[in-house]
UniProtKB/Swiss-Prot annotation:
Protein name: N-acetyltaurine hydrolase
Positions bound to a divalent metal cation 1: 26, 28, 169, 298
Catalytic activity: N-acetyltaurine + H2O = taurine + acetate; N-propanoyltaurine + H2O = propanoate + taurine; N-acetyl-L-methionine + H2O = L-methionine + acetate; N-acetyl-L-isoleucine + H2O = L-isoleucine + acetate
Job description of the protein: N-acetyltaurine hydrolase that regulates feeding by catalyzing the hydrolysis of N-acetyltaurine into taurine and acetate. N-acetyltaurine has anorexigenic and anti-obesity effects that are dependent on GFRAL receptor and GDF15. PTER also acts on other N-acetyl amino acids (Met, Ile, Leu, Val) and N-propionyltaurine, but at lower rates.
Cofactor note as given: Binds 2 divalent metal cations per subunit.
Family annotation (Pfam families): PTE
Alphabetical GO biological process terms: catabolic process; regulation of appetite; taurine metabolic process
Alphabetized GO MF terms: N-acetyltaurine hydrolase activity; zinc ion binding
Gene Ontology cellular component terms for the protein in this record: cytosol
Protein keywords: Cytoplasm, Hydrolase, Metal-binding
Entry's localization field: Cytoplasm, Cytosol
């Protein structure tokens, strides 16, 4: 039995699972997102280069990926510290920081935030989507990639002794690339050896989550300790969602607070609003999947922070939970979604 067995590994070390409390399972606290920059049309280039101020906030909120400063979340450490204190004051206990290699993971900043706020922070090992893979990453074998993932959990990430507590978010594109397929196989191999939690970022196709689970299963992964992120923008059809839920992984609705007319990263996708997300969560509960649901905001741009008029990390606790109660999701079920399910997922086998 591993020394990690029965524990959760945070950036400050091992903790008892019961200490976590209400947990957001997919957030970012320090990252850059230049890989998803969308150049604006020529007529909007000037506004895209302006600093974030009240008069252009509406444009940036509607074109989040066309404003380069907006993609530099790593510049807002002090604001994020204040938000984490607010999150804790509103009943929050822990969050999983999903930044991996390719989007500027910074475990030292995560450690400092955990020390200064008292919020349990779990860091992710792994690689983001193919567009961020280095030539070195592409050249690695599955065995070499497995070693990298395991090293992040057993010894430390980013050249530090600060250890990751999950593998992910593992980035997948659509269609899946060969490099991403190798990373998925390595993820399964590392999970099989460590008994660790895994979290996946699927490509923007309803077929992507099914393909990813199949690849993980064939490589020996434990699907019961695997999270499929971003289902709110990936599987929109009810029947297809319930078909996916049968596969046994965690279904994560992690874009709470994101309400867009036009989704730049997937123009064919009509991004649901929070009321639609709540209805999908309620559907999964009604169909018997309350033990397999997780929620979060996936904050990864500046304008989603309270400092810039955004909803912040406390939106689910302060706004979404009351609406869920109003829509018939019970306190007992909400405790499962926010406390028990994250605890079960994050605990090493």
């Amino acid at each position: 039995m591993s020394s990690l067995s029965g524990k959760v590994q945070t950036v400050l070390g091992l903790v008892e699972p019961s200490k976590l409390g209400r947990t957001l399972t997919h957030e970012h606290l320090a990252m850059t997102f230049d890989c998803c920059y969308c150049p604006p049309p020529p007529c909007q280039e000037a506004i895209s280069k302006e600093p974030i101020v009240m008069k252009n906030l509406y444009w940036i909120q509607k074109n989040a990926y066309s404003h380069k400063e907006n993609l530099q979340l790593n510049q807002e450490t002090e604001a994020i510290k204040e938000e984490l204190l607010y999150f804790k004051a509103n009943g929050g206990g822990a969050l999983v920081e999903n930044t991996t290699t390719g989007i500027s993971r910074d475990t030292q900043t995560l450690k400092r935030l955990a020390e200064e706020t008292g919020v349990h922070i779990i860091s992710g090992a792994g690689f983001y989507v193919d567009a961020t893979h280095s030539s070195e990453t592409r050249a690695m074998s599955v065995e070499q990639l497995t070693d990298v993932l395991m090293n992040g959990i057993l010894h430390g990430a980013d050249g530090t002794s600060i250890k990751c507590g999950v593998i992910g978010e593992i980035g997948c594109s659509w269609p899946l690339t060969e490099s991403e397929r190798k990373v998925l196989q390595a993820t399964a191999h590392a999970q099989a050896q460590l008994g660790c939690p895994v979290i996946i970022h699927p490509g923007r196709s309803s077929r992507a989550p099914f393909q990813i689970i199949r690849i993980l299963q064939e490589a020996g992964a434990d699907i019961s300790k695997t999270v499929m992120s971003h289902l709110d923008r990936t599987i929109l059809d009810k029947k297809e969602l319930l078909e996916f839920a049968q596969l046994g992984c965690y279904s994560e609705y992690d874009l709470f607070g994101t309400e867009l007319l036009h989704y730049q990263l997937g123009p064919d996708i009509d991004m649901p609003d929070d009321n639609k997300r709540i209805r999908r969560v309620r559907l999964l509960v009604e169909e018997g999947y309350e033990d397999r649901i997780l929620v979060a905001h996936d904050i990864h741009t500046k304008t989603r922070l309270m400092k810039y008029g955004g909803h912040g990390y406390s939106h689910i606790l302060t706004n979404v939970v009351p609406k869920m109660l109003l829509r018939g999701i019970t306190e007992n079920v909400l405790d499962k979604i926010l406390i028990e399910n994250p605890k079960q997922w994050l605990t090493f086998k």
